[in-house]
Amino acid sequence: MICEPSGGYERDLLEALWAAGIVVSLVNAARIRAFARAQGLLAKTDEIDAAVLREFGELLKPVALEAPAPERKKLAALVQRREQLLVTFSTEEQRLVQTRDPAVRKLGARLIKQLQTQVEQLEEMIEKQINDDATLKQQSERLQQVVGIGKVTASTLLAEMPELGKLSRNEAGALAGVAPYNRDSGVLRGRRTIRGGRVQVRRVLSMAALVAARFNPILKAFYQRLVAAGKPKKVALTAVMRKLVILLNHLIKHPEFTLA
């Protein structure tokens, strides 16, 4: 079976397929549309989409999506809820700044306080969920050995990137959305770009890279070399993100590996 993401609505289908023992692949919608366009199919209907999905699966044999373990599933739910509340928290703070009416400001401030309390409760639940599972706890501690990786980044990676430790270097970079893609043709050498990947993974990695570029001795030197060579700071930070996710994947894959 093959399907594509649909804003979370695909989860019930995935759960039902896993429960029935049916192998399923979840493929990025952009790949499916590119596959359709390559065949000259520009129209988009449910019937066309179903036919394209079937043919894509038959020809390219995408990797099957494994059912998450119950403890990972619980962690993912908690982490995703934390992210939702943080987005709402930020939005309400911006609204409060622009609000002038005293009564409305009071209501807004009360809501922000409630959101903050819920975020703190979720942080406690996330920490407990990780500490109650030996594997999650060990992996979280392992990730946090890297300067730049804190509890939030570690919990997000464990929840949103459960494949960590099972990937190749290129797969880790691509899944995080920090793998460089060439745009070359003939003698033309275009700029390398990044795209795709998991949004929340890329977001926490970007924050971790900012810290690592300042305080991680190895990655700081790497970042400074790139900047000194003329690379834009944003490009250099993206390179740090890629180094980070490759290192983190290696740490989980090889428990015997120790950081110098």
Kindly label every feature range from the protein language model.
Residues 1-109, 113-116, 235:
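Phosphate- and other anionic-substrate recognition elements at nucleic-acid/protein interfaces
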Residues 85, 115, 143-144, 167, ...:
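A short amphipathic alpha-helix within small helical-bundle interaction modules
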Residues 96-152, 161, 213-216, 220:
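Helix-hairpin-helix/helix-loop-helix acidic hairpins
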